[in-house]
Amino acid sequence: MDEVPSERDAFAWLLSENIELGEEEPKIAAAINEQLAHMELTSHDEFTLRRIRDVAIRHDPKKIIEVGGGIGHLTAWLLDAFSSKVDKPEYTIVEGGNKFAAILLRLTQRFNASDWVRVSGMRFQELAGESKAWLLSNQALLNSNSMEATGAPASLPADLIIIDVGELEQVECIQESLPLLSKNGLILTVEPNVPFEGASEEESNRFQLWMDLIRDIQETYRIGFVPLKKTTLVAIMSK
């Protein structure tokens, strides 16, 4: 009889490369990457984006929250992958302010995803506050087999939350995300850069906040680090 894999082995498999999905950048994502260069904006490299997509598809979430949509580079990778599935997830893209909202809305239309994807212009910290209140007030309905909770401010409880914000808000957004996860919910983010010699005190303090976060949650959450070509992908899931 085949041996049942350990939780550690299953977690490692979840975070591994999915060769079935291919390596080529989706056409719409490639066009957005060119647009980023023209706008002098940055995004994650292709290796990082591909692995986030691989893990997201393998995890098979029913409800997704993407925090920090920008102009949709990562979003395009994910929509390209999920749009081919028969059962679409409920997907919320959070991009504080209305600067890129119109771009993200047009992107969802290009994938014919307007009926299963919504764009929120709220700051994530504010949306998370509303989400926690909604989860608390609808706890009985969420545990019911015969009744359904409605009116959620985001895709809740979330099976997958992707934190793709600057290092200034990263730790706070992760902390706000933890209560929004479903039982087997997963957080994906990219590890902040280790401060180099001569870095400012602010940069050093910011990385210390990251280290403190990892230390504080490691007893109750399984944390995986996936070294990639240019970044390290970090996954957080309840034990």
Role assignments for model-derived ranges:
Residues 1-50, 54-60, 89:
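Rossmann-like AdoMet
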Residues 60-71:
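Conserved class I S-adenosyl-L-methionine
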Residues 72-76:
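Glycine-rich SAM-binding Motif I of class I
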Residues 82-87, 181-183:
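Helix-to-beta-strand junctions that scaffold the AdoMet/dcAdoMet cofactor pocket
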Residues 87-96:
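Conserved SAM-binding motif I beta-strand of class I
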Residues 91, 118-119, 187:
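Hydrophobic/aromatic anchor residues within beta-strands of the central parallel beta-sheet
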Residues 97-156, 168:
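S-adenosyl-L-methionine
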Residues 149-154, 167-239:
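C-terminal substrate-binding/active-site "lid" region of AdoMet-derived donor-dependent transferases
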